[in-house]
Amino acid sequence: MGGGAEPKSRPSRLAFHHRQCLHETETFVSKDSCLTEYYHPGGLDTAFTDPKWGADQAKLAIDQGADVIFGAGGKTGNGALIETAANKGVYCIGVDTDQWETVPEARPCLISSAMKLITPGVFDLISKAKEGNFPSGNYVGEVGLAPFHDFDAQIPAEVKAKIAEIDKGLRDGSISTGYNP
């Protein structure tokens, strides 16, 4: 689920799709997996503020056999997460922050969240400015994965190890997402 199809929402989708398509080489995603995407048709004034639309799209995806919903798009994505939580046996992944804390209604399905670690980025930029080394242009900060919370015991150690390996590879550049802005 995505709040809008504007360029800043595309990198996550493209990177995820790239990794999913490499399933035959080195990932634990099933070869029979399928990626389905829904983007809000409205402009930026509604794309990120429409939880009903997000819930409706999540229900549509679940009715078509989806077993994991990645609910991005602000309140629109939150609607998708909450709808997913109402469906036993379907999982969800949050975005931007640890949505375990911000969307508690999603906890029954919320495995983790892909987080933008804004606080360390702001700290880094302020520190650079204080030192007189404020960078011009775009700043790319840290990202991370939220804790597994209640799902922690259900995530096998080998999956956690593979996630750590992938995280390391993404950070050191040995794994490419396939996305080049």
Regions found by a protein language model. Give the residues of each.
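A residue-level marker of the well-folded mature domains of exported/periplasmic proteins
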Residues: 1-181
